[in-house]
Design a protein with these regions (language model features):
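Bacterial N-terminal signal peptides
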Residues: 11-21
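Bacterial N-terminal signal peptides that target proteins for export
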Residues: 1-12
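Glycine-rich, small/hydroxylated-residue low-complexity segments
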Residues: 20-306
Length: 306
């Protein structure tokens, strides 16, 4: 909801992922090689081949990124990436050290090991071996209209799940990128859509969570519903329908009958600050014009007031 935070997050995330920092050269690849690559720590980014993609884009293939360690004595494993495609990027804004007003980037084949971080063993926890991940971001800020359009922010975990977010925010400008408080008050949501497509991750994650809790999957689902019950109590039909969809999706964790989709279409301008005063689920749903849909939804009895 905070326009500036989202804009800054998109800008920084894109820049760090692609190591972009400025330029005013004619070819996207030339901009990268002449002005960006020399600034990177030695050995932090390598690639087998690269080519320009118009004035503001480039493609790198056979990429290996070695992130800096968390501590001076620490060590990090290199991350293999099949391809990074920058179709369009606002080099001019970045050269001025201001948030890029547009970016369209696709990162394909990010290799994720079964031990992505210290103390985390996905294979032991959930039977998840190493897998590939794709990432896409496509956004544009119109400073004159103070409108941020996120056409797509997508994370695709091969064989596990896909998450996609799109939205339009009003009241967003580069000037408030460093002022979260102003963004909370000024940025308003026009519309948003979130899609969670499960392919197998819930079937792996639910039993894994149950194992960590010392129980079984049924007990874990019961705990989740028990925690959700107070949020449902005393709420109206629209709130109950939203909770029905969520609970049905979780009930079908072994094999969901389609994606879970959340859409937001506020009837009036709504900011994060305004939402903070919501008294319950009904208020939130009314303010956001929220709708949760799942093709396998079945009614669940609403908890009664005590």
């Amino acid at each position: 909801m905070t326009g500036s935070v989202r804009l800054r997050g998109l800008a920084v995330g894109t820049a760090l992922s692609l190591c972009l920092t400025s330029p005013a050269l004619a070819d996207g690849m030339a901009k990268f090689e002449k002005l960006i690559k020399p600034q990177l720590p030695e050995g932090s980014l390598t690639y087998k081949s690269g080519k320009g993609l118009g004035d503001n884009g480039f493609v790198l293939e056979g990429v290996v990124v070695t992130p800096p360690p968390d501590t001076p004595s620490g060590k990090t494993e290199p991350i293999a990436i099949k391809k990074i495609s920058v179709e369009d990027f606002d080099f001019t804004a970045f050269e001025k050290q201001t948030p890029p007003t547009y970016a369209k980037v696709r990162i394909e084949g990010i290799a994720v090991s079964d031990k992505p971080a210290e103390g985390i063993d996905l294979k032991e926890m959930a039977g998840i071996d190493k897998f590939n991940m794709d990432f896409q971001v496509d956004y544009r800020l119109e400073p004159e209209r103070k409108t941020l359009t996120l056409n797509k922010l997508e994370l695709d975990l091969s064989g596990l799940a896909r998450l996609e977010l799109s939205m339009i925010l009003d009241g967003v400008s580069p000037d408030i990128a460093g002022d979260p408080d102003a963004a909370m008050n000024d940025a308003t949501l026009r519309t948003a859509t979130f899609v969670f497509e499960d392919r197998s991750i819930l079937a792996k994650a639910v039993p894994a969570i149950a194992k960590m809790q010392g129980g079984d999957a049924a007990a874990t689902l019961l705990i989740a519903k028990t925690m959700m019950a107070p949020l449902r109590t005393g709420q109206g039909p629209k709130a109950q329908a939203a909770f029905d969809a969520i609970e049905s999706f979780v009930d079908d964790y072994k094999k969901p009958k389609g994606p879970l989709k959340v859409t937001l279409n506020p009837p009036d301008k709504v900011s994060a600050t305004a939402l903070s005063s919501a008294a319950g689920a009904d208020d939130v749903i009314k303010a956001l014009g929220l709708d949760v849909s799942y093709s396998g939804t079945v009614p669940h009895p609403a908890p009664k007031k005590q």
